[in-house]
């Protein structure tokens, strides 16, 4: 899907924060994400909030605006050293914000999409592939033996920012819990299926890579698309929950989502990384260079492309230098909505990313990995090189759990 294409830009002190041309069909009218400059003191941030509230009220009163533009700040976000907020604003207030000495950028909020799965017929090769060094088999149906350490992610928390998770699904055996619901006036349940599917690949008893990990649901979607207003709310909550619970080295975030490049969210992921938190993301399903996508282009996320059983890249999978590795992403069965035993077979980088998030959880449970840099290095060190046909400039690396070297 083609969304907005934003470029990274930097602002000098007191310079005007000029808007970047965007794809208007994906902009959410009247709604903005404002990023404050680094290094502001608490007093400066408070002064900015006071100034904004007064300026916005004055402009709304003068012009008689109503609707989303009159709502002002919805939510402030703080992720490590990053300060930002989502707001409904009129154009005059936006112009004044862009001249503020405290503001780094003011960007229209935009839609972001699930890296959505496509339903296919029967399947089941993916877990066997993860423990087989990626060697192709005469038939995908013969890749049925998944070998793994029995610790299997125990004591690790996998956060799924998605459509919610059916925590009562039999795949989770009571190991899934509800965390944050960022969608107003909607229940924290998965009526769409995508989040349950993703969580099942990470930690399901049958379909999961890390079969004893705990899944934490953060609902930021109520269908196939959402906005950064809700994405940032869930992501901020996850980072705070991990930090407050003192489990940075035992937690992983999965983002099976994709949109056009959007610098504020890339910065949020980078700040989580600097805070010591690992994020795994889908490369996206546009069949293009993943450097055009967020969160795929986030420099310190682990970006995952999709792979078929015979070591070919499906045409839908994004590619390029920002992709770190490939994992199974076609004909993958996992849990679904429609009942506590429901399953679905599907394809997409939405399936590839949770294989690696599950691998991260698995490795965290059996090894001492104290930082996201160590996690990334270990995952990439275990990969099998040179197997992917048509890698299209991506690092030619395939995810592997290292079990044969551990036996």
From Swiss-Prot:
Residues 124-407 form the Peptidase S8 domain. Residues 18-115 form a propeptide. This is Subtilisin-like protease CPC735_013710. It is found in: Secreted. The active site is at residues 162, 194, 350. GO terms for cellular component: extracellular region. The keyword Signal applies. Glycans are attached at residues 145, 241, 254, 341, 381. Belongs to the peptidase S8 family. It comes from Coccidioides posadasii (strain C735) (Valley fever fungus). Transmembrane segments: none annotated. Pfam families: Inhibitor_I9 (PF05922), Peptidase_S8 (PF00082). The keyword Glycoprotein applies. Its EC number is 3.4.21.-. The lineage of its organism: Eukaryota, Fungi, Dikarya, Ascomycota, Pezizomycotina. It comes from the Eukaryota. Secreted subtilisin-like serine protease with keratinolytic activity that contributes to pathogenicity. Residues 31-114 form the Inhibitor I9 domain. PROSITE patterns: SUBTILASE, SUBTILASE_ASP, SUBTILASE_HIS, SUBTILASE_SER. GO terms for molecular function: serine-type endopeptidase activity. InterPro entries: PCSK9_ProteinaseK-like, Peptidase_S8/S53_dom, Peptidase_S8/S53_dom_sf, Peptidase_S8_Asp-AS, Peptidase_S8_His-AS, Peptidase_S8_Ser-AS, Peptidase_S8_subtilisin-like, Peptidase_S8_subtilisin-rel. Keywords: Glycoprotein, Hydrolase, Protease, Secreted, Serine protease, Signal, Virulence, Zymogen. Residues 1-17 form the signal peptide.
């Amino acid at each position: 899907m083609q969304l907005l294409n934003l470029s990274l830009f930097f602002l000098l002190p007191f310079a005007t924060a000029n808007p970047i041309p965007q794809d208007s069909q994906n902009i959410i009218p009247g709604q903005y994400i404002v990023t404050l400059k680094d290094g502001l003191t608490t007093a400066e941030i408070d002064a900015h909030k006071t100034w904004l509230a007064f300026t916005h009220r004055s402009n709304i009163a003068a012009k008689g605006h109503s609707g989303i533009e009159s709502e002002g700040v919805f939510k402030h976000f703080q992720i490590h050293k990053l300060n930002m907020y989502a707001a409904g604003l009129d154009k005059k207030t936006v112009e004044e914000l862009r001249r503020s000495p405290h503001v780094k950028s003011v960007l229209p909020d935009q839609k972001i999409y699930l890296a959505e799965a496509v339903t296919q017929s029967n399947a089941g090769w993916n877990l066997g592939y993860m423990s087989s060094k990626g060697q192709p088999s005469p038939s995908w149906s013969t890749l049925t033996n998944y070998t793994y350490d029995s610790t299997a992610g125990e004591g690790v928390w996998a956060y799924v920012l998605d459509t919610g998770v059916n925590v009562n699904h039999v795949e989770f055996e009571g190991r899934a819990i509800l965390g944050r619901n960022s969608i107003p006036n909607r229940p924290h349940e998965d009526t769409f299926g995508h989040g349950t599917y993703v969580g099942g690949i990470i930690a399901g008893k049958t379909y999961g890579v890390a079969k004893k990990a705990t899944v934490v649901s953060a609902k930021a979607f109520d269908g196939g698309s959402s906005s950064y207003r809700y994405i940032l709310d869930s992501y901020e909550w996850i980072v705070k929950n991990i930090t407050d619970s003192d489990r940075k080295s035992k937690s992983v975030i999965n983002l099976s989502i994709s949109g056009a490049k959007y610098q504020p969210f890339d910065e949020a992921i980078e700040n989580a990384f600097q805070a010591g938190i690992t994020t795994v993301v889908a490369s996206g399903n546009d069949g293009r260079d993943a450097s055009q996508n967020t969160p795929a282009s986030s420099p310190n996320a682990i970006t995952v492309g999709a792979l078929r059983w015979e070591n070919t890249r499906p045409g839908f999978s994004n590619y390029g230098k920002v992709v770190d590795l490939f994992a199974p992403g076609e004909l993958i069965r996992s849990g679904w909505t429609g009942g506590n035993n429901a399953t679905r077979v599907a394809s997409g980088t939405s399936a590839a990313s949770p294989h690696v998030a599950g691998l991260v959880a698995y490795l965290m449970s059996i090894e001492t990995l104290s930082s996201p840099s160590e996690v990334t290095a270990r995952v990439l060190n275990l990969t099998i090189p040179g197997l992917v046909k048509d890698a299209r400039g991506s690092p030619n690396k395939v995810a592997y759990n290292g079990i044969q070297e551990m036996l």
